A protein has these predicted regions:
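Non-transmembrane domains of secretory- and envelope-associated proteins
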Residues: 18-27, 110, 160-163, 191-249
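Acidic/charged, solvent-exposed loop-and-adjacent secondary-structure segments enriched in E/D, K/R, S/T
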Residues: 107-146
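Extended beta-strand-rich segments in extracellular/periplasmic secretory proteins, especially
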Residues: 143-210
Length: 249
């Protein structure tokens, strides 16, 4: 199965909570699960186009960390995404990726572009590949939406004060989404067959945007976890998305 490197960004685009100044709202603890879900759905309404820059660090057990800078442009109207990763010191392009029309196009200045069906695309870590996630799991988050798994009929819910947990399970995997005050705070994923585990935790709120200030992703398979940390550096929620900005070659 194909894997992509340095792509932990795919697990994080939670939305902002919405409050109307003229309306006195009940404390979140007093809302029903249905009311909380409706507030979450409304809070995650995606922008037509946005652009963000971020720094990413990867840590493997017993090895020194690796760093890269990244940018992402998301066209929600046409379901297109463009990533670029560069060296943090010299600014040299390391890799680039476009997602559109059901395919992932990934390449680098040294390698030809690979075309991979989205259903077969795996968000991976570095050398030991302990971070392994199906891209579909986080696709809606990357487009600025909550995964439909959160609202599915077979999803189970539980609450702890201001926190809401949505647990979805099928034959292959189990996913747990944690929300607090209408914002996603963590996603936990377990693949049953190969015991691949991953957990993404989002902290803080980047000003005037739906992004967290930091996302930490840990992945492990029967051993110490591999870690990736993403720190957001700039966000433009009114960016322009044009055809030329989503090349496939």
């Amino acid at each position: 199965m194909n894997k992509a490197l340095i792509l932990a960004f795919c697990s994080f685009i939670p939305g902002l909570g919405c409050k109307t100044p003229q309306t006195q709202e009940l404390p979140v603890q007093e809302l029903s699960v249905r009311d909380r879900l409706e507030k979450i759905r409304a809070a995650y309404a995606p922008a037509p186009c946005f652009y963000a820059s971020f720094g990413v660090e990867s840590f493997q057990p017993g090895k020194s960390g690796q760093k890269a800078d990244g940018t992402v442009r998301v066209d929600n109207a046409n379901r297109r995404v463009r990533f670029c990763f560069t060296d943090s010191i010299f600014g040299i392009t390391l890799s680039h990726m476009t997602i559109r029309d059901g395919f992932v196009y990934i390449g680098s200045p040294r390698d030809p572009v690979q075309q991979i069906p989205v259903d077969r695309f795996v968000v991976g870590g570095l050398a030991n590949n302990s971070i392994r996630l199906p891209f579909r799991l986080f696709e809606d988050l990357m487009y600025g939406r909550v995964p439909e798994q959160v609202f599915a009929d077979k999803t189970h819910y539980r609450t702890e004060g201001a926190r809401l947990f949505a647990e979805y399970e099928d034959r292959e995997s189990k996913s747990v989404y944690e929300f607090e005050n209408d914002r996603m705070r963590s996603v936990t994923y377990l693949h049953k067959q190969d015991r691949a585990n991953a957990k993404a935790e989002m902290t803080g709120t980047y000003p005037r945007s739906p992004f967290p200030q930091k996302m930490e992703l840990n992945g492990w398979i029967d051993g110490p976890p591999e870690k990736m940390i993403v720190n957001f550096q700039g966000v433009d929620m009114t960016a322009v998305c044009k055809e030329v900005q989503f090349p496939v070659n």
